Design a protein with these regions (language model features):
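C-terminal beta-signal and adjacent terminal beta-strands/loops
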Residues: 33, 38, 86, 138-159, ...
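Membrane-embedded beta-barrel scaffold of Gram-negative outer-membrane proteins
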Residues: 2-57, 198
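Gram-negative outer-membrane beta-barrel transporters
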Residues: 29-31, 51-142
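Outer-membrane beta-barrel domain signature
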Residues: 1, 60-65, 104-106, 167-171, ...
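C-terminal beta-barrel architecture of Gram-negative outer-membrane proteins
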Residues: 110-185
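Extracytoplasmic loops and strand-loop junctions of Gram-negative outer membrane beta-barrel proteins
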Residues: 6-7, 53-61, 98-102, 160-168, ...
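Membrane-embedded beta-strands that build the outer-membrane beta-barrel scaffold
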Residues: 9-17, 21-29, 72-78, 84-92, ...
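Residues that define the transmembrane beta-barrel architecture of outer-membrane proteins
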Residues: 5-9, 66-70, 107-115, 174-178, ...
């Protein structure tokens, strides 16, 4: 197999606001070529790998696939001054590809938009102790998926997509997740102690990851991404 090739065209704008804030804008256009696809006509493209955890066993591959990505990104950030910082980013984009069947489709990564916002605040509560509180919000458009091939799925006992209708449907809900973190750090002479408590997906939002096969009609069920997860840890830095 040969190497996948890409060409990029990028235009950006960066503006410093005051002493500690910055606004950035970037628009881009990218073309992809030589993407591995199957020799027989199908919707498969290696450009989609990495979007999930499904196994795939492709036929013989050839470097003839293509793809196109374009969009805009906005970033507003405040650097760490006066004991706190924050940053927000918004991406609006479109991602298409062509398999060996020559049909242009939405890629697995084409959620149309993504939004992230994070902040952290720090308080010095003693000579050596620092309390930190932070949070993060992540949002993205609904993931795309393909209708089930019921006959093939029942025969193979796993979710088999209708190849001709690859990524023509979308899950009902957009992706959203809120994380929070609180930590306490003690700066000793030779070592730094840190005790932290992370709250992952504190609203326990049920974000759909994929559909999987089930033996009962309608022969598929929803599989969800990580729900609420509290994580405690203690760290030593020497």
């Amino acid at each position: 197999m040969g190497m996948t090739r890409s060409k990029h065209l990028v235009l950006g704008f960066d503006q410093v606001i005051g002493k500690d804030k910055r606004f950035k804008f970037e628009t881009y256009y990218q073309t992809l070529s030589n993407i591995p696809v199957t020799t027989r006509p199908s919707s498969f493209s290696l450009a989609n790998t990495g979007s999930g955890f499904s196994r795939f066993f492709p036929d013989t591959l050839v470097n003839s696939g293509t793809g196109t990505n374009y969009g805009v990104e906005f970033t507003f950030e405040k650097s760490f001054t006066k004991g706190y910082f924050y940053m927000a980013t918004l991406s609006l984009f479109d991602a298409k590809y062509k398999g060996s069947d020559g049909v242009e489709r939405n890629s697995d990564f084409n959620t149309d938009y993504a939004f992230n916002a994070l902040f952290a605040k720090e308080w010095k509560v003693s000579k050596r102790g620092i309390l930190n509180l932070g949070g993060k919000i992540t949002m993205a458009g609904a993931r795309r998926y393909s209708p089930i091939d019921t006959f093939a799925s029942r025969r193979q006992r796993e979710y088999v997509e209708l190849d001709a209708q690859k990524n023509t449907l979308r899950f009902g809900n957009a992706y959203s997740r809120i994380d929070a973190r609180i930590s306490y750090k003690i700066n000793a002479k030779k070592v730094t102690h840190e005790i932290a408590f992370d709250l992952v997906n504190i609203t326990n939002n049920r974000n759909i990851l994929k559909y999987s096969y089930t033996s009962d009609a309608p022969y598929f069920r929803e599989e969800y991404q990580l729900g609420f997860l509290p994580v405690f840890y203690y760290k030593l830095d020497f």
